[in-house]
Amino acid sequence: MANNTIKRRKESTEKYIDALLENNSKLCGVRVDLKYKQEFAKDVSLDTINKDLKRMLDNRRNNKTVFGNNLGYIIKKEVSDNGNPHLHALFLEDGNKVQKAAYKADQIGKYWSEDITKGKGCYENCNRREYKNNGIGMVDYTD
């Protein structure tokens, strides 16, 4: 990917998060990778993952248990070396109401795997792993 594209995406992401922090004193970054179980992954097209993602995002308004405190999201679609599409998702939650990012990531992941993909999906809760510079968890407007 060209350096200009990376720079533009970084600036756009920073602007987006800054805009959310203008109206919210805290954001809780919830990172979850959404994918498909190995036995189904080879049959999943980019069109399928796009439809599943759209359905999940469209359903946010009606699923207050999982998405009631969601303020926004950043999602990166990828296709792995073996051709399996998956999503790297960062859900930005109201940090005054959501403090347990790992718990929220499990809620989102289970919704993806059980309801959206009807048992064909799986997820990885990135909030339960240690990263050097993870960019997840609580962000205060003063940061």
Describe the residue ranges of each PLM region:
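Histidine-centered divalent-metal-coordination microenvironment in nucleic-acid enzymes
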Residues: 72-95
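Eukaryotic short linear interaction motifs
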Residues: 39-41, 82-83, 97-99
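Short aromatic/hydrophobic contact patches that present stacked aromatics
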Residues: 31, 90, 143
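Signature for HUH/AEP ssDNA processing cores
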Residues: 16-79
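Short, solvent-exposed polar/charged micro-motifs at secondary-structure junctions
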Residues: 41-43, 84-87, 133-137
